[in-house]
A protein has these predicted regions:
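Catalytic active-site module of serine/aspartate enzymes centered on a nucleophile-bearing elbow/loop
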Residues: 213-242
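Flexible "cap/lid" subdomain of the alpha/beta-hydrolase fold that forms the substrate-access gate
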Residues: 3-37, 41-213
């Protein structure tokens, strides 16, 4: 999505293709390896890059999303068992096109409601969370970016729609199978930064899978790099300088 070619095939968004793009960049610029950093889905790609191409990753910096243990059950099936079929990961897969259309009809409203901080806690509600965000006329909390910055995202998604970004979720079980033969232990030096107000919980036993990890946190929600840019940059620079 964004300024990419936005391929239509769902499979083009699986972890094999996403990590393959990074390998292609390394090869193009003739780099043996690199330090990779990602946030949320970007962190998922970085973790997977280290699983599939460990020799191409010298260090990792990941924000918000911890390492995900593969477990014994495909991820989507596990999520449906735990959270139900209205959980947005599951909904995207079991009701293809439904959320896509609603988000596409409410681009500005959805993004305005998504990119917020310090929103008051909301109790569980019926229906699908992302659809609620797209339909909510009154945003909660405070914006994490200026109206000018937000307009860039609005223009991008008005151009492409949301299906391409949702296709990342539609490869969840496929990714589980693609990672079946990868060693689950990552030995690269790693910095993991959590937002203390983020709804995504830390992985308690992350050191079982990433033994060479430094775990930090900042007073922020999910959008750490937007909420605490100076503190995060300083934390990263200090870690890289160790």
């Amino acid at each position: 999505y964004g300024e990419s070619s936005c391929p239509k095939e769902v499979i083009k968004y699986d972890i094999e293709h996403l990590t393959g793009d990074l390998v292609a960049l390394l090869d193009h610029y003739q780099y043996k390896d690199a330090i990779f950093m990602g946030h949320d889905w970007g962190a998922n790609v970085v973790w997977s890059m280290a699983l599939l191409y460990p020799e191409r990753v010298s260090k990792m910096i990941n924000l918000s999303l911890p390492y995900q243990d593969r477990g014994e059950k495909p991820w989507l099936d596990f999520m449906e068992d735990v959270f139900g079929e209205e959980y947005y990961f599951v909904h995207f897969n079991k009701q293809p096109g439904v959320a896509d259309a609603i988000l596409d009809e409410n681009v500005e409203q959805f993004l305005r409601n998504l990119y917020r901080k310090n929103a008051p806690s909301q109790g569980p509600s019926e229906g699908m969370e992302m659809i609620h965000l797209a339909k909510a006329t009154k945003p909660l909390g405070e914006p994490i970016m200026s109206a000018e910055d937000l307009s860039v995202y609005i223009a991008a998604f008005n151009k492409t729609g949301f299906t391409s970004s949702i296709n990342w979720y539609r490869n969840l079980n496929r990714n589980w199978h693609l990672l079946a033969t990868a060693s689950p232990i990552l030995h690269q030096p790693t910095l993991m930064v959590y937002g203390e107000k983020d709804l995504i919980p830390p992985l308690p036993n992350i050191t079982d899978f990433v033994p060479n990890i430094d775990i930090k946190s900042l007073d922020a929600g999910h959008w750490i790099q937007e909420e605490r840019p100076e503190e995060l940059n300083q934390m990263i620079l200090e870690w890289l300088g160790k």
